[in-house]
Regions:
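Short, intrinsically disordered low-complexity segments
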Residues: 2, 141, 193-197
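SAM-dependent methyltransferases
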Residues: 169-204
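Acidic-glycine-rich active-site phosphate/pyrophosphate-binding loop
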Residues: 17-36
C-alpha cells in the first residue's frame, strides 16, 4: 500500500474547515499536492506532529483536527499518546503512515521494523479506537470512522517511496505558519498573532 493512495482517500473525506497537521518529509509534500489549503500546518519536527494536533484539538474543540504522522516521528515522542488518552479530545484523529523506516534521511529501519506495534501502544495508553490498516480496503474503512466522535488512531502500513514532489525550497514553512495562524484568526474571530504595523515577511 502506498502512502499517496491513502492520502488520496483521506483527502476525499476531509472537510474544508478541517485542520490538518503534517509531519516533515514525504507526507507533507504529498498532502500539499492533494489538498493545498491554509488550514494545513506543515513540517512539524520529529516528535511534534501529534502533540501540536492535540493542542489544536483542545483549543478548538468544535473543529476536527487531523494529524498525519509517521512511525519514526511518533516513536520519538510516544508519551504524546498518553497525553492524548488523558485529555481525550473527541475531535482529534491521528493517522500514522508506518513504512518501518526513517525514509527521508536514507531509509534506516525504525523500531516498527523490529516488531514494535504502534496500535498496541496506543491501546495500552487507553486510546480504545486504535486500528491497523494493512491494505487500501482497510484504510478506507478507517476513514469512514472520521465522522464518529472520539479520538481515532490509525496505523497504516505502507511501502517506502513517494510521488515526484516539488523541492523543499518551494515551500516557505515560516510563511505557512503565518498563513495558518491568520486562517485561524479569520475563521475563529480570535487573535493569534500580535498586531504589527508591518508584516514580518516584508521587513528588511
Amino acid at each position: 500500500m502506498k502512502r499517496f493512495e491513502c492520502l488520496k482517500a483521506l483527502a476525499a473525506a476531509v472537510r474544508d474547515d478541517d485542520l490538518v497537521v503534517t509531519n516533515l518529509g514525504n507526507t507533507m509534500h504529498e498532502w500539499l499536492t492533494l489538498r493545498p489549503s491554509r488550514a494545513n500546518l506543515y513540517n512539524m519536527n520529529l516528535g511534534q506532529c501529534t502533540p501540536v494536533a492535540l493542542g489544536l484539538a483542545l483549543a478548538l474543540p468544535h473543529r476536527r483536527v487531523i494529524a498525519l504522522d509517521g512511525d519514526g516521528n511518533l516513536l520519538l515522542n510516544l508519551v504524546s499518546l498518553a497525553d492524548v488518552s488523558h485529555r481525550k479530545p473527541a475531535n482529534l484523529k491521528i493517522f500514522v503512515f508506518d513504512n518501518e523506516a526513517y525514509e527521508s534521511p536514507g531509509g534506516m529501519p525504525s523500531a516498527t521494523a523490529h516488531g514494535v506495534d504502534l496500535v498496541q501502544i496506543a491501546k495500552g495508553c487507553g486510546i480504545d479506537r486504535s486500528f491497523p490498516a494493512t491494505n487500501l480496503e482497510e484504510f478506507d474503512q478507517r476513514v469512514e470512522l472520521l465522522d464518529q466522535s472520539g479520538v481515532l488512531f490509525v496505523n497504516a502500513k505502507i511501502e517506502m517511496g513517494s510521488i515526484e514532489r516539488p523541492p523543499y525550497n518551494e515551500i516557505d514553512f515560516k510563511f505557512n505558519k503565518y498563513q495558518f495562524a491568520t486562517y485561524i484568526e479569520e475563521t475563529e474571530k480570535k487573535p493569534v498573532l500580535r498586531l504589527r504595523s508591518r508584516s514580518p515577511f516584508t521587513e528588511k
